[in-house]
Structure formats: structure tokens, C-alpha cells
């Protein structure tokens, strides 16, 4: 399944864009926690994401949201200056597949979109922490790349239907906070790895 908030800021440890059973299917695992989208125009970057870190929300891309619709598929429309971008998310249950379609509705000059996935590869009841065992490497796949942080997990494929350049730059981001977990008195800080 896919589960997050309307502004795509995870507040629970079981939130994620790719949460699925592995092995015997009794437990769900968060593979893809979230995805940062950045609109680039005139060499300026506008990150559409919002994340909570200790004492701060950063980036604050929620301010660019102009519309949200839940049906027929979750759809968010962003406006950044002269750029209007629509994001539609469709979960294909039987295939354990998430499709995200970006449509550039309006732009007055050349515009690029940069995507940065944040990976957890963990049981949905646990939290991920930076470690030296995670494999941040990516491998070429048709239309994109595949990665797997730990050997016992399935490959996660990230593919596009357009020509795209993947820049490998594996790195840990520290102390993502999940507000609802904190409110309930549970552990609420997590580190996530981005492959690039």
C-alpha cells in the first residue's frame, strides 16, 4: 500500500510510498519512505516536499500546493512562479507497483524536475537508522535504476517513461521525525538513505 498525509509529510512510521509484504506476507515493510520533487527553472530550485526534522520543517514545499483531489486518484497540483505541475499517484495492488505521473500544465521557460527517493527497507513497526550494512548502490534497469539496501529484500525499481539521468550519490539523511509517533510516546526519529 501507499500511505502518507495530503502534503506528503509522513507522520507515522507505517507511512510510506511503497509498503508491502515480503516473504510469508505476515508483515509489511516500508521500502520507499518518500520522494522529494524539485522544480528547476532559471537555475533556481524549488523543493515541493515537506519533512519534519528536530525543531523545523524543511523543506516547506507545502506552500506551493494549490489543489488536492483524492478521487479518482490522489492528485496534487503545485504552482511555483509560472510553473504549474500536477502529480497523480496510482497504487497497483496486485502488482505491488506505484505509478506517479507528473504533468507540466504551464511553464513559461524550460523546466526540469529532479526526484530524490528516500529509502527505509524496514519492518513497518520499526525505524531505520544509519548503518554500514545498507547497500546504497544502484544498478541499471530498463528506463531507470534498481536498488536493494539489504540482501533479504526484493529489488526496488525506479523507472521513468522519458529520458532521464540518474546521478548516483548515496547518502544518509538523519533525524526525520514522525509527529504522530512522538505524540503517542513512541520512538519517532528515523534516518533514511537516498541513492541519488
Predicted features along the sequence, with ranges:
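Terminal accessory carbohydrate-recognition/targeting modules of carbohydrate-active enzymes
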Residues: 1-196
Amino acid at each position: 500500500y501507499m500511505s502518507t498525509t495530503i502534503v506528503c509529510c509522513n507522520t507515522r512510521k507505517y507511512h510510506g510510498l511503497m509498503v508491502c509484504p515480503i516473504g510469508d506476507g505476515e508483515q509489511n515493510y516500508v521500502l520507499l519512505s518518500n520522494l522529494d520533487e524539485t522544480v528547476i527553472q532559471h537555475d533556481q530550485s524549488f523543493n515541493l516536499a515537506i519533512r519534519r526534522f528536530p525543531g523545523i520543517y524543511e523543506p516547506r514545499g507545502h506552500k506551493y500546493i494549490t489543489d488536492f483531489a483524492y478521487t479518482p486518484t490522489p492528485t496534487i497540483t503545485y504552482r511555483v512562479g509560472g510553473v504549474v505541475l500536477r502529480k497523480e499517484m496510482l497504487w497497483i495492488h496486485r502488482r505491488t507497483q506505484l505509478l506517479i505521473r507528473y504533468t507540466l500544465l504551464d511553464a513559461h521557460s524550460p523546466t526540469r524536475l529532479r526526484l530524490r527517493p528516500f529509502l527505509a527497507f524496514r519492518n513497518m513497526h520499526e525505524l531505520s537508522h544509519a548503518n554500514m550494512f545498507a547497500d546504497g548502490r544502484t544498478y541499471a534497469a530498463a528506463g531507470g535504476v534498481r536498488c536493494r539496501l539489504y540482501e533479504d529484500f526484493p529489488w526496488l525499481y525506479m523507472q521513468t517513461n522519458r529520458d532521464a539521468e540518474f546521478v548516483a550519490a548515496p547518502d544518509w539523511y538523519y533525524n526525520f521525525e514522525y509527529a504522530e509517533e512522538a505524540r503517542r510516546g513512541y520512538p519517532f526519529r528515523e534516518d533514511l538513505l537516498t541513492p541519488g
